[in-house]
A protein has these predicted regions:
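Surface-exposed molecular-recognition determinants
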Residues: 1-427
Length: 427
C-alpha cells in the first residue's frame, strides 16, 4: 500500500493489487514534470526547509533520525542507511565479517613459516601463487593439511612438494622445504580463508553418514562422505537452512569439480575446473537440496569414493549468491549485494568463459586494473583490462569483457562482505 500526503493530509491510498500491470515488477517511480526554469526540491529527511524554501519543521522519525516538516506516521522511517536493520554480522554486532572470512597476502620463505593476520583458525584455505603459472591449492580441516585439492584440475588430492599445512589460531603454518607454489622463496601468495566450526561431527541426517564442520552464523559448512558405488543418496550439511551455493569434488582422480547455485534451473551445474557454459547432463547432484541434506549421484562418478562439499547459505549483509545480466561495456552492470564486497567470484553461464576471482586485498582501491585470478587455470594474476569497483552496497563491472560482463548474457556470482551496507562506504 502506498499513501500520498499533501501538507500532512492524506489525499490518496493505492494498494499494490490496484496498480496497473506496468508496476508488476514491484517498482514505483515518483516524477516531477518541470517547465522552463522551475526547480523541484525533495526532502528524504535531510532538510525540512527544502533548501531554505519554507520554515523548518524539526520532526524526526520514530528512531530519532531525520528532519521533516511534519511528523512521519508511526512505522515510517527516513530513507537512509542508518535505518537499515542491524545485521547479524556487522560492525555493531557480536561478530564481524572478518571473523568468518578473510584474505591474507604473504611472501614465501622457502622454509617453514607461520602466516598470521587471518583473525581466526581457518577451516578452509585456498592458496594461489600470484606471480607464476602454478596450480591452486585448497586445504580443509576435515581432510587435513597434507594433500591439496586443485581447483584447476580434476585430479585427486596430492601434496605440494613436501608442504604440510597446520591451521592455527590466527592463520596457518606451512612446513617443508620443497614448497614452491605455496611457500617458495619470494613467491607472491594469496590465501582466502573461511571459518567453519573448528571441529567436526558425524551427521546422520542423510541416507548416508557425513562428517560435518558447520558455521551456522556465517552459513558455511564442510561436508565429507563416502559415496555408494551406484544410485542417488543424500548427506546432512549441518546448516539448518537450504544452501544457496555448493562446490563439490569427488576425491578420486579424473572427477571434475561441480558447482551448483540457487539461480541455476533444476538440473544445471557448472565445472569449477572448466570454462564450459552451464551444463545439464551427467547429473553430478541428485538436486535434492533442503534445510538438512544435499543430494549426490554415484552414477555420475561410477565408483565408491570420498566426496567433499563446501556448502554456503546466504546471510544478509555478509554473503550473496545470485546472478546478473551483463551489458558489454566499460560502464558496466551494477550488482547490488547489500554490503561492500571483499571477495567476488564471477562465471558467465552462457558461453565458454573462465571463472574470475577478485578481492580487495589484491585490489585495495577502485580503478586499479581488476587483479583477477582464474580458479580454473594455473595463470598468474592479471592486473589490467578487467577492472571492478567495490562499492558500499555491491560492485560494478568496469570492462566490456565478455567473460564477466557479456552483453545480455547471464552471469552468476558469489560474494563475501567487508562491511554491511549499513556501515559501509565505497572504496
Amino acid at each position: 500500500t502506498v499513501k500520498f500526503y499533501k501538507n500532512n493530509s492524506l489525499v490518496n491510498t493505492s494498494s499494490y493489487g490496484n496498480l496497473t500491470s506496468e508496476f508488476d515488477d514491484e517498482h514505483i517511480a515518483f516524477m516531477s514534470i518541470l517547465f522552463g526554469t522551475n526547480t523541484c526540491v525533495w526532502n528524504f529527511g535531510q532538510d525540512s526547509t527544502f533548501a531554505g524554501q519554507i520554515s523548518a519543521g524539526g520532526n524526526a522519525d520514530e528512531n530519532g533520525i531525520g528532519d521533516f516538516k511534519y511528523a512521519p506516521p508511526s512505522g515510517h522511517l527516513a530513507l537512509c542507511s542508518a535505518n537499515l536493520p542491524e545485521p547479524t554480522i556487522g560492525s555493531n554486532s557480536a561478530t564481524q565479517a572478518d571473523d568468518h572470512f578473510n584474505t591474507v597476502l604473504y611472501t614465501g620463505s622457502g622454509s617453514t613459516q607461520s602466516i598470521t593476520g587471518v583473525g581466526f583458525q581457518s577451516d578452509w584455505s585456498w592458496f594461489k601463487r600470484r606471480d607464476a603459472t602454478v596450480n591452486h591449492a585448497l586445504y580443509d580441516s576435515i581432510r587435513g593439511g597434507t594433500n591439496a585439492l586443485r581447483s584447476n584440475t580434476n585430479g585427486a588430492p596430492a601434496q605440494f612438494g613436501d608442504a604440510v599445512i597446520t591451521f592455527q589460531s590466527d592463520g596457518f603454518q606451512i612446513a617443508g622445504t620443497n614448497v614452491s607454489g605455496i611457500n617458495g622463496s619470494s613467491d607472491s601468495m594469496v590465501a582466502w580463508n573461511w571459518k567453519a566450526s573448528g571441529s567436526s561431527v558425524t551427521n546422520n541426517d542423510g541416507s548416508i553418514a557425513s562428517t560435518v564442520s558447520a558455521n551456522t552464523t556465517a552459513g558455511f559448512s564442510i561436508v565429507k562422505a563416502t559415496s555408494p558405488s551406484s544410485g542417488t543418496w543424500t548427506v546432512g550439511h549441518g546448516l539448518g537452512a537450504t544452501p544457496d551455493f555448493i562446490i563439490q569434488k569427488y576425491l578420486a582422480s579424473n572427477s571434475r569439480w561441480t558447482v551448483w547455485q540457487n539461480t541455476l534451473t533444476s538440473g544445471q551445474y557448472l565445472g569449477l575446473n572448466e570454462s564450459n557454459a552451464v551444463a545439464s547432463s551427467g547429473t553430478p547432484f541428485n538436486f535434492t537440496f533442503n534445510s538438512t541434506v544435499i543430494g549426490g549421484n554415484s552414477n555420475y562418478d561410477g565408483t565408491s569414493t570420498d566426496v567433499i562439499y563446501y556448502v554456503f547459505k546466504e546471510i544478509d549483509g555478509y554473503s550473496k549468491f545470485a546472478n546478473f545480466t551483463g551489458n558489454g561495456n566499460a560502464d558496466g552492470t551494477f550488482v547490488y549485494t547489500g554490503f561492500r564486497p571483499s571477495w567476488v567470484l564471477i562465471k558467465n553461464t552462457a558461453r565458454s568463459a573462465d571463472w574470475r576471482l577478485h578481492d580487495v586485498a589484491r585490489q585495495p582501491t577502485n580503478d586499479d586494473g581488476g587483479h583477477i585470478l582464474l580458479p580454473n587455470s594455473t595463470s598468474s594474476e592479471v592486473t589490467s583490462e578487467y577492472d571492478i569497483d567495490f562499492l558500499s552496497n555491491g560492485f560494478k563491472l568496469r570492462s566490456g569483457d565478455v567473460y564477466e560482463n557479456g552483453d545480455g548474457e547471464l552471469l552468476i556470482y558469489a560474494a563475501f562482505a567487508e562491511d554491511p551496507f549499513k556501515y559501509a562506504n565505497a572504496k
